[in-house]
Swiss-Prot record:
Keywords: 4Fe-4S, Iron, Iron-sulfur, Isoprene biosynthesis, Metal-binding, Oxidoreductase. GO terms for molecular function: 4 iron, 4 sulfur cluster binding; 4-hydroxy-3-methylbut-2-en-1-yl diphosphate synthase activity (ferredoxin); 4-hydroxy-3-methylbut-2-enyl-diphosphate synthase activity (flavodoxin); iron ion binding. InterPro entries: Dihydropteroate_synth-like_sf (IPR011005), IspG_bac (IPR016425), IspG_bac-typ (IPR004588), NO2/SO3_Rdtase_4Fe4S_sf (IPR045854). Its EC number is 1.17.7.3. Its cofactor is [4Fe-4S] cluster. [4Fe-4S] cluster binds at C264, C267, C299, E306. Binds 1 [4Fe-4S] cluster. It is an enzyme of class 1 (oxidoreductase). It catalyses: (2E)-4-hydroxy-3-methylbut-2-enyl diphosphate + oxidized [flavodoxin] + H2O + 2 H(+) = 2-C-methyl-D-erythritol 2,4-cyclic diphosphate + reduced [flavodoxin]. Pathway: Isoprenoid biosynthesis; isopentenyl diphosphate biosynthesis via DXP pathway; isopentenyl diphosphate from 1-deoxy-D-xylulose 5-phosphate: step 5/6. This is 4-hydroxy-3-methylbut-2-en-1-yl diphosphate synthase (flavodoxin).
Length: 349
């Protein structure tokens, strides 16, 4: 996959942009002032494969809590700031690796200058995060609604503010809950700037709908070589965002570790409880780091042949199944033992 080369920006120990890998981000949904709960969730996200995590900084108590949170984690933390520049200054002082702001909504130029000065001193980048729901009245009047051109113009207006202050450690996002708007916004921005782009469909929805929208939006852009870091936004446990994000990247070859799982849709030839077997295999292997393809197929007639590219898999028969490797049958097993035998063999690979 050929990606457009962008500027590289360092976020903690992670580089975003350049020729560095596409990273995965998420955001905590805890009360940031609750240090224990926030740290617990951050560690869960990191264990799931998150590279960079963001938390909301709503008030000074939350900004002060950043210090204790940073001391207990080893993953880059981004502070999400709106309106009050003092929250950004306190979060920077307390050790965040980056901040997300829109320079145009935190007040006078002097306030923006104070934030930029603090970021420069700590070598901290700024993500300009434009959303379709937060465009200025002027842009909405000009374009009539949150169009791709409106989102890009908003982002570049904020970029200009930072560039005028000789600040260039910038990441840009232009998110919309409308997938077509989101895709076109990033296409336009990719042509107009070489700052790294943070991809995401905002307010994508519950895991089912949100996964589909995010896969289409993020996936389309990645296929075109656009995007340096991603965040899948889902209503629910943010760990699910990481799982979906990893699968999107895996299907484009950006993530090499972890199981690639394939299974057939079942048909009239299926004579085992394939649906539950597939669910169990996928769940049992969810934390496996091995870079192998595993197939769960419904029948012995076509299973091994159809899954010939799989490293290992099972094909169901009547109350039994075959375990195969690279399309070659290696073992016949009773249905109730299929999953256990498959897992045992995978552990030896």
């Amino acid at each position: 996959m050929n990606r457009k080369e962008t500027r590289k920006v360092k976020v903690g120990n992670i580089y975003v942009g350049g020729d560095f890998r596409v990273s995965i981000q998420s955001m905590t949904n805890t009360d940031t002032k609750d240090v224990e709960s926030t740290v617990k969730q951050i560690k869960e996200l990191q264990e799931a494969g998150c590279d960079i995590v963001r938390c909301a900084v709503l008030d000074m108590d939350a900004a002060c809590a950043i210090k204790d949170i940073v001391a207990k984690i080893n993953i880059p933390l981004v502070a999400d700031i709106h309106f009050d520049y003092r929250l950004a200054l306190k979060a920077i002082e307390n050790g965040v690796s980056a901040i997300r702001i829109n320079p145009g909504n935190i007040g006078s130029r002097e306030k923006v200058e104070a934030v930029v000065k603090a970021c420069k001193e700590k070598n901290i980048p700024i993500r300009i995060g434009v959303n379709s729901g937060s465009l200025s009245k002027e842009l909405l009047t000009k374009y009539g609604k949150p169009t791709p051109d409106a989102l890009v113009e908003s982002a570049l207006e904020h970029v200009k503010i930072l560039e005028e202050l000789d600040f260039h450690d910038i990441v840009i996002s232009m998110k919309s809950s409308n997938v077509e708007t989101m895709i076109e916004s990033y296409r336009i921005a990719s042509q107009k700037t070489n700052y790294p782009l943070h991809l995401g469909v905002t307010e994508a929805g519950t895991p089912w709908r949100g996964t589909i929208k995010s896969a289409i939006g993020i996936g389309t852009l990645l296929a075109e070589g656009i995007g340096d870091t991603i965040r899948v936004s889902l209503t629910g446990d943010p760990v699910e965002e990481i799982k979906v994000g990893k699968e999107i990247l895996k299907n484009f070859g950006y993530v090499k570790e972890g199981i690639e799982f394939i299974s057939c849709p079942t048909c009239g030839r299926t004579q085992i409880d394939l649906i539950n077997i597939a669910k169990e295999v996928e769940e049992r292997l969810s934390s496996c780091k091995k870079n192998i393809k595993v197939a769960v197929m419904g029948c012995v007639v076509n299973g091994p042949g159809e899954a010939r590219e799989a490293d290992i898999g099972i094909a169901g028969g009547k109350g039994e199944g075959l375990i195969f490797r690279k399309g070659e049958i290696i073992k016949k097993v009773k249905e109730e033992d299929l999953v256990e035998e498959l897992i045992k063999i995978i552990e030896t690979i």
